[in-house]
Amino acid sequence: VAYTAGPGLIGSLMVGETVAKTISNVLDIELLPINHLEGHILAPGLEDENLETPYLCLLVSGGHTQIIECSEYGSYQILGETVDDACGEAFDKVGKLLNLDYPGGPKVSKLAEGGNPARFNFPRALMKDKNLNFSFSGLKTAVLYALEDLEEKDYPDVAASFQEAVVDVLIRSEEHTS
């Protein structure tokens, strides 16, 4: 029985571990703790069973934004990561600024579908740096200030411009690794 041992929210991790241990004990089968992030890193192998190492992983989840080199199973090196907010955190916080429900990511993306991504030129931090790190806190702050003078009818443009800036930053990192 495999279960997520971390990282993650402690309450969820404890519930998962307790259920997994119970099933393992009742069925008398092996218990296998799994690192949540390693699951993301290895996910490409679900689509391509012939996936060869080394490969690069752009890991973008709620609490993590990293570029990871997978040289072989169990051997990973972080090449770049966020220096402040993770991409998912930025989406959630911008969603809150736009009066959207949690989680913000899917709701911001849905709102962005009706917006103009070129209306606001939000900052794209660390784009010219040689390293592969990310920064999304300045972008989030720029959205906060932009919203001060806007009406709700402008929110789709804000969402689209924000999302465009995030994607530009993520693509830049991918281009630096090519």
Please describe what each predicted stretch is.
Residues 5-10, 78-82, 128-131:
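A short glycine/serine-rich beta->alpha loop
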Residues 109-174, 178:
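A contiguous, well-structured pocket-lining segment that forms one wall/lid of small-molecule binding clefts
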Residues 29, 33-56:
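Conserved phosphate-binding catalytic cores of ATP/NTP-utilizing and phosphoryl-transfer enzymes
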Residues 49, 61, 72-116, 140-151:
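Glycine-rich phosphate-binding loop plus the immediately following alpha-helix
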Residues 1-21, 25:
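Short beta-strand-loop/turn "lid" adjacent to the catalytic site in phosphate-handling enzymes
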Residues 4-9, 35-41, 64:
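Acidic, glycine-rich active-site loops and adjacent beta-strand->loop/helix elements
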Residues 57-59, 65-69:
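Short beta-strand scaffold segments in enzyme catalytic cores
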